[in-house]
Amino acid sequence: MANVLVAMSGGVDSSLAAALLLEAGHQVTGVTMHLWDDDEQGLRESLCCAAEAAASARRVCALLGIPFYVFNYQREFRRHVIDYFIRAYTHGLTPNPCVECNRMIKFRALLDRARTLGFDAVATGHYARIIQGEDGRYQLWRAVDLEKDQSYMLHMLGQAELSRLIFPIGAYTKREVREMAAARGLPSADREESQDICFVPDGDYRNLLRIESPESLVPGPIVDLEGREIGRHRGLPLYTVGQRRGLGLGGGEPRYVVAIDPARNALIVGPAAALNRARFTVIDACWVDDAPPAESFTCLVQVRAHAEPLPARVSQQPDGRWLVELERPQRAVSPGQAAVFYRGQQVLGGGWIARPEVA
């Protein structure tokens, strides 16, 4: 049996993960990652990151009779997640901080520390499945509960990471997880879920930008698809592709943010139909098998955490980028978001959606 470090948020998913591993005979230790100080300017704690999360995780570990620790990752979280989040918006991109947190904190810093401390594996409460094929290679699959599936956020995991990770609840539905936790008397069985970015729990990232990067909020022109100025914006980081509200353009046909042009400090707007894209480019691709399936292949592509996966052809370009050609157009494909490639329920890999002008 393995010596497993379980990343615990205090919620029902990671709590049950720890319980299941313990019941399977593993040696289990719980850990909560401390990501910032409560009084850090501009940042508010939410369910997944507050001091109450550590207290909840500690109670679960006490009930299970396993050790519990808190690891401090404030500096890493600031550099790799919050600074990245702000930098992306100031460059006209729509960031995905959860993907970066998984990539840099949970599945790099925590895995490295676990190895140093002598743990065989790290487990989390993510809804995804790891399957070892007949060839010995590790595969990443969607969770059984497709509504809770988090494989999109885990596409950056390769063989080195998957070989040392365990996702104990990926084979269960959320309802089953709650029932199993309640049956074991876990205090987190009925704990409310957090739906927001952990450092922006009210959902309004603009307040964070106003505090952390006020110099980036430079007013500029709003232009239509013909290049005519039809209004003024309050700073590009305050807008995202697909946004309609808050443009201040008055009546008439509804207009949406179609593109963001940092070079001209311009916000480009157009009708809803202009949001549809059938082709885009992906940069910095990574692959679960550590190599792409081919230079050109067909698959399903998902461009947002809860978007419908669409059939597409993906082809490598001479500069190393990947051209994605969708079978039918997708609405609001946002530069800066992850595009994740699937073969059925299996994750192949993914990368970051580039701006149209570099496609």
UniProtKB/Swiss-Prot annotation:
Position of the signal peptide: none
A single BP term in Gene Ontology: tRNA wobble position uridine thiolation
Active site (record annotation): 101 (nucleophile), 198 (cysteine persulfide intermediate)
Keywords associated with the record: ATP-binding, Cytoplasm, Disulfide bond, Nucleotide-binding, RNA-binding, Transferase, tRNA processing, tRNA-binding
Region of interest: Interaction with tRNA: 148-150
One GO cellular component term noted in the UniProt record for this chain: cytoplasm
One of the record's GO molecular function terms: tRNA-uridine 2-sulfurtransferase activity
Broad class of where this protein is predominantly found: cytoplasm
UniProt record similarity statement: Belongs to the MnmA/TRMU family.
Protein name: tRNA-specific 2-thiouridylase MnmA
Gene source species: Chloroflexus aurantiacus (strain ATCC 29366 / DSM 635 / J-10-fl)
